[in-house]
């Protein structure tokens, strides 16, 4: 047995992930949504669809800020009802399937750096659309959701052109300069766009004040998330070193859709007992260096999205429980069958992706 711990890697393995987490935070300074101008907000199915899209599309860029913005407005009127809880958890969590601005994508690209970005996003968007269709079917067919009386809070989508421009910049630059890491491009363009557009939307002195406030007040509030990812990297490398020293090897030769499906199930079960997906990813990442990185990354993203919406101890659900006086058990019961359906969809998707990649 030969135990060697790479302490340098332990503290730096998640540095790109942290860079993205901090850089994308600047986007909310220029891409924050506005309330729809229509004072008579629609009720029922139309309201559900518009609100779902609002949380999902803005959540893909400005992260949990979009969910809190909508949920705060809902909670002011009355306690969150089952339909609203389902919308908030699923609309936000399904961003993890595809959004390159989401921290889940950063985790995937950290441990599977050779992934095919376009393939991941394409399959991820399909999963996000499927998640919406399953959710919409659930709330319209089950009378307990009382969808005809649903009160939503749609947001104006006019500022969404900014992340679209950002995505075009990132993907086109990566196409011409494939050696540049996507995660570095997203981080760089996020800050550059903020520095360029904020003074155009406000005046220069106001933009300076907003930037100063964000750097001095908002960034320090991210200490919990940053600590989680630093500890995950450290813990993952230490566990990996121990397993390597014990001559641990994976019980399979080819990482195909069958192994990926089993790995996805393990991720989900571990998340339900409190082990964050980033911890599991960090622990096993080094053992999959020879696997197909696109299939591996897709498995990571599927695990992240499916568990975030359902696990009673995910960061998202703990926030909803604490902030809006909801029941963790209720959230779990509302989403557990959704998670099961999405797992089946994910397995089918892994099979198709595996065939597409000729594995």
Predicted regions and their residues:
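Alpha-helical transmembrane segments and their membrane-interface exit regions
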Residues: 18-28, 75-77, 127-137, 189-200, ...
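Helix-loop-helix module between adjacent transmembrane segments
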Residues: 54-62, 88-98, 272, 303-309
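Membrane-core helix-loop-helix motifs of multi-pass transport proteins
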Residues: 78-163, 172, 318-349
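Membrane-embedded alpha-helical segments and adjacent helix-loop junctions characteristic
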Residues: 2-74, 208-288
